[in-house]
Amino acid sequence: MKEFADSFENNKITGIGLDVLDKEALRSALAKHDAVLNLTGPFFKFAYPILEAALEENCHYLDICDDWEPTEKMFALHELAKENNRTAIIGLGASPGITNLLALKAMTELDEVNKIYTGWDISSAEPEEESSQSDVNAAMVHGIEQMVGKVKVFINNKFQM
């Protein structure tokens, strides 16, 4: 991360290594910055506490959270963000994120929209001969969590588990 941040000519971008489970170290790091881009997964585990700490340390916040579980809790921090005059934007990855923006763009081109569906086409995906990962990573943990966990659905005008 530091190497990536250092590749920008603008020295206002920094990358740090941090144990985000160490609340004091997290708060100390956030206190030195105006904004945080949280890429720390799995998000069902780390998104809410990092957002909460960022807002309490008066940081603007962006992430690529793609887990529904913390998203509901994170929305509850809206008032804290408003009180601190901070912006918090969650779900800026591929899906949610780019898929939402593409759907919005498509909707603006139509006279009327009843529903929008997004999806992934993985039919052309080819398995790797050898994994590029030497260990379990956040994406793997996220995938398993989403496959075996419960999912909230919207049926008959209400959310259900």
Question: What is each stretch, according to the model?
Answer:
Residues 64-88:
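Rossmann-fold NAD(P)-binding glycine/threonine-rich loop
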Residues 42, 51-72:
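ADP-ribose/adenylate-binding Rossmann-like module
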Residues 84-124:
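Adenosine-phosphate binding glycine-rich loop
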Residues 3-13, 77:
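Short, conserved SAM-binding/catalytic segment
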Residues 17-35, 39-45:
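Conserved Rossmann-fold cofactor-binding substructure of NAD(P)-dependent oxidoreductases
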Residues 14-16, 89:
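General small-molecule cofactor/ligand-binding pocket signal
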Residues 108-161:
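Active-site-lining helix/loop region of Rossmann-like oxidoreductase modules
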Residues 11, 30-35, 56-57:
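Short acidic/histidine-rich motifs immediately flanking catalytic phosphotransfer sites
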